[in-house]
């Protein structure tokens, strides 16, 4: 027994437990058209009648929307969606399962789409057109050059691409020269063109002419008198009397070859013998432009980044002649201690530049150069930084190694750029650090670049324009390696020795470095103690001791730096880290000489003295 449900387009529903026979009899009385749907399941066939339409009041024929049959053998027959009869309610097509699967899909789609639509609506609500235009205007104003350059490059590439597309012609097949001679002897060559200025030979054969004729015949022009001239646009009429525009193409050559040198006489005699039409013509201007453009695109565009990098290396934009603009607080002469004699010399020069000392009424001239000489770490660069902070004039700071380049002549060019920039901002100061890198004695090496750079420096310091207010301050720790012409009066008129500080100088230097360091004891006592324990130390060594002491205090978790941290830092600076064999003897002897009233420290390394405290209240130094 099977159950059938019938749904018609006028919303009339047939349902109930009808057998196929009853259903067919029920429907056949009111049906105008019957179709049969046959389905197979498990080698069994089952037939069911499908209703084509109903008659209602004898006026309208209605189409069936759906017929569904279900049997006990799990057989189901769904009629296909089809408009059977045209009527008032049967004109629209309906899909099977529209109330089932499509409804679930539509619901899932709406659940996914709703939050996205809500998010888009919120963003559109917050969108401010005026603010967007202001941002766009600011972007254009800030990046106007880049936008113009990018637009121009894109436009040029677009025009080049359009030109290449419009001027594209079919390329002929390349054949050997021997094949060309063979075709000439065989008489199959119809026309030959010798291109002037090159070795290319274009030719067509008789087979090519026939193919071309067939192509023209297929077009079947009504008026044979209408010809297509080369490079002009004419009007043609086809069989259907429809006028159309035809643009003439250049002559298409099927084959091309390259002629052999000193074979022109043989080739011309052979063509004359065979009666072949030949001619010569220069390459057209359009093709020349196309060839040039292709060469530029394929050769120069890949080289453009390399040329740009090379230009940046050779240009003055990478020059060290840049005015020093430091965002950090500048260093003054109050921050320089321990080198009083050198500081006095530089203070005098700064005063002359600022106009505090009237040196002109006495007939004096500013020294052209000041050479700071001294061991490493004595504060030569710090003095130059103090000059930059106190002078109030343009200050140019460079390193001598920046003038030595791979390319010959670039060092001299950078020297010229540096002094030109200094002259434009005169009075000004130029500081050259580590002068021995470029100012070494000439003739000791084969480096011509270094010699040319030194020659340019000598010329700039004492050349024809010697009355300009440009002072050169240089620092070196190898004065014996400098060239004698560079150290003569008139170039470096003053040679200032920046020596190692004495005990009082070390105390002043320590006082400067300990200004921002919290101490457990009095800073004056610590400064005296460290200055007395560090003979021969320079400013860089003392700054390192203070920094090491602060690091040791941070390691042990202290809130301030103690004497033990400072003494440990002194031991690290003198003897290195973990060098316990050299520490006790040397430092103990020094402390015994300093404090003779204290007990002898010779026994402090004994096994019974490990827990005792050393002098000044700190633990033993081992």
UniProtKB/Swiss-Prot annotation:
Spell out the residue ranges making up region: Disordered: 600-622
An annotated GO cellular component = chloroplast envelope
Q: Where is the transit peptide?
A: 1-42
Query: Keyword annotations for this protein?
Result: ATP-binding, Chloroplast, Hydrolase, Membrane, Nucleotide-binding, Phosphoprotein, Plastid, Protease, Transit peptide, Transmembrane, Transmembrane helix
State the compartments where it is located.
Answer: Plastid, Chloroplast membrane
Loss of this gene results in the following: Embryo defective.
Q: Which residues carry this modification: Phosphothreonine?
A: 86
Q: Which domain of life is it from?
A: Eukaryota
Membrane-topology descriptor: Multi-pass membrane protein
**TM segment ranges:** 147-167, 291-311
Q: Which GO terms describe its biological process?
A: proteolysis
Main localisation, per the record?
plastid
MF terms (GO), sorted A to Z: ATP binding; ATP hydrolysis activity; ATP-dependent peptidase activity; metalloendopeptidase activity; zinc ion binding
Q: Where does ATP bind?
A: 374-381
According to its UniProt entry, what is the function of this protein?
Might be involved in chaperone functions or play a structural role in the thylakoid FtsH complex.
| Family note | Belongs to the AAA ATPase family.
Q: How does it assemble?
A: Oligomer.
Q: What is this protein called?
A: Probable inactive ATP-dependent zinc metalloprotease FTSHI 3, chloroplastic
Gene for this chain: FTSHI3
